[in-house]
């Protein structure tokens, strides 16, 4: 018999590395990047394909809008095919690393929002783990 673990518990355990957290850094684009765990593998370039676990939520309410953790399946994607916030942030990480991102609307979904889930001009938070960089 398979036991199901509530997604909130999995997410809490998954990102329970705050004790290792570095101070947040704000980049010129407005990205607020906080390393929670330093990775030891390769860092991706914008042209690489990466495998990531993530949880996206609104900073004001904490309401989750998407989570690969809740689905139990990391995602693979070319780094130059996602929102600019992710392209910038994941290049600051190494495989095995975890980080918290705050993405202002200008480098997230902007004035268009996304598919009725993310309103226009929304600032977004993401907890991300860079699992691997394909081919590195």
Residue ranges and their predicted role:
Residues 2-136:
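Cross-family detector of peptidyl-prolyl cis-trans isomerase
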């Amino acid at each position: 018999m398979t036991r199901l673990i509530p997604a909130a518990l999995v997410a809490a355990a998954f990102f329970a590395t705050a004790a290792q957290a570095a101070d947040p850094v704000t980049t010129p684009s407005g990205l607020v990047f906080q390393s929670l765990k330093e990775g030891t593998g390769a860092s991706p370039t914008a042209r690489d394909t990466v495998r990531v676990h993530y949880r996206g939520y609104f900073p004001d309410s904490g309401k989750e809008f998407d989570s690969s953790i809740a689905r139990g399946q990391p995602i693979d994607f070319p780094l130059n095919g996602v929102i600019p916030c992710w392209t910038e942030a994941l290049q600051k990480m190494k495989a095995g690393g975890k980080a918290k991102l705050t993405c202002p609307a200008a480098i997230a979904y902007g004035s268009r929002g996304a598919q009725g889930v993310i309103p226009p001009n929304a600032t977004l938070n993401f907890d991300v783990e860079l699992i691997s960089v394909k081919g590195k």
